[in-house]
Amino acid sequence: VAFEPLSLEEIQIIFIYRKIISNDEKGKILIENGLSAIAPMLRRAPDPEGEEGYTLFHYSLREHILKSQDMANSVQTAKEAFCELAMKPDDQEELTNYLYRTGIDHFIDVKDFKAAGKALLNFYWLLNLFNLGKTPSDINSYWSQLPISKQQIDACYLFSLMGKDHVGYSDGD
């Protein structure tokens, strides 16, 4: 469910955070052995910073995993873990850049639109997004995925810009 390749260290931090492995050499070896066991399904690829990480070899495998009933619980647990981590992106130094770059994507993925909106209104988060290579177009794309309601303080402006027939419009919160 990661939105970009993750390094061994980043994967290890996620597993430590979820208390799946210990924070020592044994935990690291367990991750290395696990990656070796599924190596035919993985490929190495750079993240936006040029750091090499692991990703699934084929996009179709990712889609299969995301849609498989057998994997539904594991996928949901992983999505929740990424969202929890993204709530405080500075807490895990090795993941900070990844969490700022993709945290809003993770919030939107689990339909936590409130968290996504709060991140988009957080100037420190926006500064990090721009410093990590995101553009105003990327920010606009995030906003376009969020529902709009009459309850928002800026609703009158949004409705005049996008219209009541906008795909994100709703009468609720």
Sequence positions of predicted segments:
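C-terminal leucine-rich, beta-strand-based interaction scaffolds used for sensing/assembly
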Residues: 3, 8-92, 100, 107, ...
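Alpha-helical positions within canonical tetratricopeptide repeat
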Residues: 77, 114-115
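Solenoid-repeat scaffolds in large eukaryotic assemblies
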Residues: 103, 115-119, 155
